Amino acid sequence: MADRLVRATAAAGGIRLVAVSTTNIVREARERHGLSFLTSVMLGRAMTAGLMLASSMKVRHGRVNLRLGSDGPIKNLMVDAGRNGTVRGYVGEPALELDPIQDEAGHFSFNFKEAAGTGYLHVMRDDGKGEPFNSTVELVSGGIGEDVASYLLHSEQTPSAVFVGEQVNSAGIHASGGLLVQILPKAAEEPALVELIEQRCREITGFSQRLAASGDQLEDLLLDVFPDLDPKPLDDAEASQELRFFCPCSHERSKAALLLLGRDELTDMRDKDGGAELTCHFCNNRYDVSAAELQELIDGLPAAA
C-alpha cells in the first residue's frame, strides 16, 4: 500500500492531528543510500517529521527543510519535505551502527543521543514568497520527535506533541510513521481541555507497536490513541494525501551545477578526466557528463576578458 498522510481534528475542533505512514519511503531511502538500521530509523523519523511539518503550509509548493548539525558520529542529517507529499534526505554516515541501549525492563532501543551528540536542529520553511523562515533550536534527544516538538514550542509558539516511530526486523523496516498533535488557539483558552489533551498525550505508550498494528489505516490509529476525543478526518479533499520519496535531480540539472565551476575547472575536467561524474546527495543517483557535454558547457560560457 502507498504511504499516506491524514489530516484530522479532535476534541470538537480543539486539536489538529496529522498522521503519516512512511514505511515505503524509508525502505526506498535505505536502499538508495545503503543505510544501517540506526541511520534508516533516524532518517526515517526526520522524513516523517518533515512531512508532518510541511502539511500545514498554505501553498502546495511550500517546502520544509530539517537539518541536524551536531558533533555526533552521524555527522549530519538533511531532509527536504514538501506540502505536495514528496520527501528526500540523506545522512553524513549512512553505515553508522551503534550498540543499542537497554532499559530497566530489558527492552532495547536505538542510541539516538550518542549518534546525534550535541548540536542543533535547523528548520527552514519556504513558501516561495520572499525570504524563507529559518529557526534553530538545541537538540533535546536526537530522536527527532522531542527535537521537533521543541522547535514548534519555542519557534512557532505552538504547544505540540510529536510521535515518530518504527518497527524494525531482520528483513529491514516493517513499519514507519508518525503523529503530530497541536493544540489550537480555541482549545488553548480552556485549561481543562488543555490538561486533558496533555494527559492523553502522556498516556500514549507503545506508539511504534500501535502504528504497526494499524497498517495503512491511519484513521484507526487516531481512534486508538484518542478514543475519547472523537478524532475526525477533515471533510474535504485535503483529508488524505499520498506520500512518496522523490528527488527532482536530473542530468540537465547536473550539467547546470557544473557551470558554477567556471571555464578553467571545466576545461581541466575535460582534458584530465575525459568527463565528470556527479552524485546527488539526496537520492544517490549518479550522473555522467561526457567530455563533449563539458565542451558544450564551456562553449556556452562568456568569453574570457
From Swiss-Prot:
GO terms for biological process: protein refolding. It comes from the Bacteria. GO terms for cellular component: cytoplasm. It is found in: Cytoplasm. GO terms for molecular function: protein folding chaperone; unfolded protein binding. Under oxidizing conditions two disulfide bonds are formed involving the reactive cysteines. Under reducing conditions zinc is bound to the reactive cysteines and the protein is inactive. Keywords: Chaperone, Cytoplasm, Disulfide bond, Redox-active center, Zinc. Disulfide bonds join C247-C249, C280-C283. It holds the Pfam family HSP33. Redox regulated molecular chaperone. Protects both thermally unfolding and oxidatively damaged proteins from irreversible aggregation. Plays an important role in the bacterial defense system toward oxidative stress. This is 33 kDa chaperonin. It comes from Synechococcus sp. (strain CC9605).
